[in-house]
Design a protein with these regions (language model features):
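Active-site-adjacent structural elements that line small-molecule/cofactor binding pockets in enzymes
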Residues: 1-319
């Protein structure tokens, strides 16, 4: 069983104006502070390339993608990257993937975003076969792939993104974990976890522990709740309130929202943990005790970003 320290990861690279070298330096610093798990999303930078560079400067911290978008990257191309990274940092990569959103895949990449969960199921089947077995013979709706390279394998854990109930169920069926993002904790406990376990049971995986649910949580290191809520509003409304998958999830979680609107205060209050280091640590411990398997802690800067990142990282490392 993982220790509490191993169950709490730290998000880096959230700044879209951040240079790659800055993200690498944060990963190196986080390991130096005692952090066991790093998570990084796929913004305008390539996460796996950053991880490859960071892996040469670190020795133990686990590196998790949250997430790599599936539609723009063929599973064989992703497998090539993963094989290289696993050779540089054996056993340290946790590969989180997901279908992303129509406004991104169609609006930015110009690709079709049809049947995202069907596409994700096929993607994981091809990717796992190539990585874990070195061979695949797959003929489906989205992929026709025949490969046989048994000498190049890497049993890298494959986690998938999940917001809706069907996505959590799919994660339980096919993945090595589910990655949530901005999901209220009651929704995760009452909808996400049961669906994850249902999927695992349907796939005949009930003999072993179900795949872990990694819960994304927002943290503001301030005792001023108004500042914390303002930071939460800015983050949610800038990144997520205009995306239908999030609006649907918020509504099903009991926080009705509409596309492009301001997030309700009660939703932001539910999502943001605030206080000094001791108060935040207590709340994170409570979340782990509630039934969540792991936490992905995302700092909401208030005043001094560098200082707050340092303090939060130290708090996590001291679990």
């Amino acid at each position: 069983m993982k220790s509490i320290k191993e169950r709490v990861g730290f998000v880096v690279g959230e700044g879209y104006n951040e240079r790659p070298i800055a993200a690498i330096e944060k990963i190196v610093a986080a390991e130096g502070d005692g952090i066991r798990q790093i998570w990084m999303n796929q913004g305008h930078l390539d996460t796996l390339t950053i991880f490859a560079a960071a892996a040469t400067k670190t020795s133990a911290v686990r590196l998790g993608t949250a997430i790599v978008q599936t539609y723009p990257r063929h599973p064989l191309a992703l497998a090539q990257q993963v094989l290289v990274l696993n050779d540089i940092a054996p056993g340290r990569l946790r590969l989180g993937i997901g279908p992303s959103h129509s406004s991104i895949i169609e609006g930015i990449f110009g690709l079709s975003h049809k049947k995202p969960l069907v596409h994700l199921r096929e993607y994981v089947e091809v990717l796992r076969a190539v990585l874990w077995e070195g061979k695949v013979n797959h003929h489906g709706e989205f992929f026709n792939v025949v490969v046989n390279t048994p000498r190049n394998t890497a049993r890298v854990p494959i986690l998938v993104s999940a917001l809706g109930e069907k996505a959590f169920q799919l994660a339980g069926e096919i993945a090595d974990g589910a990655l949530s993002w901005l999901c209220p904790v009651p929704y995760l406990l009452n909808t996400g976890l049961p669906a994850l376990r249902k999927g695992a049971a349907m796939a005949g995986r009930s003999a072993s522990p179900p795949p872990p649910l990694v819960a994304h949580v927002l943290v503001a290191l301030t005792t001023d709740r108004h500042l914390a809520l303002a930071a939460g509003h800015q983050y949610i409304e800038k990144n997520n309130i205009s995306l239908p998958f999030y609006v649907n999830m918020f509504t099903k979680a009991g926080f009705p929202t509409t596309l492009g609107s301001a997030a309700p205060d009660i939703l932001v209050d539910n999502l943001v943990i605030s206080g000094n280091e001791d108060a935040v640590t207590v709340r994170l411990s409570e979340l782990l005790a509630s039934g969540l398997d792991e936490l992905m802690v995302n700092l909401l800067p208030i005043k001094d970003t560098a200082d707050e990142q340092f303090r939060l990282a130290h708090s996590i490392a001291e679990f």
